[in-house]
Amino acid sequence: MVASEIKSPVSVPETPGSSSVHHRKQLSVFFIESDNRRLALGRGYTGGTTPVNIHGKPIANLSKTGGWIAAFFIFGNEMAERMAYFGLSVNMVAFMFYVMHRPFESSSNAVNNFLGISQASSVLGGFLADAYLGRYWTIAIFTTMYLVGLIGITLGASLKMFVPDQSNCGQLSLLLGNCEEAKSWQMLYLYTVLYITGFGAAGIRPCVSSFGADQFDEKSKDYKTHLDRFFNFFYLSVTLGAIIAFTLVVYVQMELGWGMAFGTLAVAMGISNALFFAGTPLYRHRLPGGSPLTRVAQVLVAAFRKRNAAFTSSEFIGLYEVPGLKSAINGSRKIPHSNDFIWLDKAALELKEDGLEPSPWKLCTVTQVEEVKILIRLIPIPTCTIMLSLVLTEYLTLSVQQAYTLNTHIQHLKLPVTCMPVFPGLSIFLILSLYYSVFVPITRRITGNPHGASQLQRVGIGLAVSIISVAWAGLFENYRRHYAIQNGFEFNFLTQMPDLTAYWLLIQYCLIGIAEVFCIVGLLEFLYEEAPDAMKSIGSAYAALAGGLGCFAATILNNIVKAATRDSDGKSWLSQNINTGRFDCLYWLLTLLSFLNFCVFLWSAHRYKYRAIESEEDKSSAVL
């Protein structure tokens, strides 16, 4: 290890009696260019983030690579992945119930667990991309795995050997549990191909947005604008995939059967894979920086070993950093020292006893320590979005059950209940279409931010709108329930009430769509910009992890509510008969939890210190 370039200044006293507070305030003088916020090092590539080609060599002419053309190849891959993901989420519960003859509740729990594990395990994909494979090869490997899983699901739905006997299994027999159950090996096959698909999605999800953002030139004066528009277009591709899944795939399933429906997803993924690989010559790549988990572990171990060392010790030399412009981490710029989480600075505390070539488990660079600080600093923001994911998960089940009791006709056209979740997607599509022409000019006048609102402000707007959405859902469900009881539908919970339209649900759907587009797009952009250079994919995985935890949290909340509200007759807020249950009370509970979560977010966002600013204009926009 190269000797430290940063030495202890003469002006700093080394007497044990010095004030600890004084030394905390002065600690940053041991690192060059220190400040509470990081200056962006000229937004150039001198810090180790030089774009390279697929062979790992620097790109001589950036004009022939990257940009919007390369990004559109990536959009196609994400649209197909989301189409498959939502296509499975909306169809798999029904497939397990109607075809595999599994109980509805266990089918729903199995799919919720699949969705949760798929999203939560995105951290693994982000780790592999940042540590060893790079984002391109991670996407290439896992998108192929995704395709293999979809082909397996298609075969399982198409070949009779993989499903139980369907003869003499009408709807009444199905409800009474008299149909032939799926054999254990048939369920094992289904779960195997399903989780192959899930882990394929987990590898793609944290990498696609980061890889797309990598295609833009950090030295360009329009970089921030391009990045802002990229994440909006990226989420637009996500939305288009969801809309196709909730309409075309549902239609194919109803008209042509399960095999064709899942086959449609496999064909779409195959085409998107071909397009993704066709764009290979255009892509800009970033070199993986080595195992980020190892670097985090080294910082924690080194800080623990030196927990009793003092910054005023006579053995103290300075805070360690390698000389030169580049950091010791491949693909990462140096990160100046910050004054929070002082206890972690012990890992970079260079003592005389460390010698000329100390172990990385005893002495870490300032940049390495700051990486860990950033990861810790980021945690509260995506954590606050778990509540939004919980609400979205509840909507997928609760609002569909509401729709079964309502009139879904548009003139002479009857809309399938399973198509109802398309409306949040349509509202997202509309909001993204109007974002730059309507929202940005209006909010620019209010905030003075050239982009309309900062990333954290957009996350906050999304969380606030989600509170309004779930509050409205509670109001309407209370009205729907009383209407059903007063008009003799109390025990006919699968019968549509002809005079009460399902399109009252559009209000909560559209509001949650608005909440989603502001919160998730703002969060993705925030995590990409704030994550360390060599941990961009892990930063993006934070958002997916929050989504997965939201799925699990919804299951846990439902179980708690059932146990806490069950009466002597076995009825609870979540009774199978929606008209005798109290879904409205659950919506009120979600409203309260969402409000408390929003308060926590405001506190966390107010305390957050942005990692990088470039100008005074950006400084003012960084305040929530």
UniProtKB/Swiss-Prot annotation:
GO terms for biological process: oligopeptide transport. Keywords: Membrane, Phosphoprotein, Transmembrane, Transmembrane helix, Transport. One of its GO terms (cellular component) is membrane. Expressed in flower and siliques. It is a multi-pass membrane protein. It is found in: Membrane. GO terms for molecular function: transmembrane transporter activity. Belongs to the major facilitator superfamily. Proton-dependent oligopeptide transporter (POT/PTR) (TC 2.A.17) family. This is Protein NRT1/ PTR FAMILY 6.1. It comes from Arabidopsis thaliana (Mouse-ear cress).
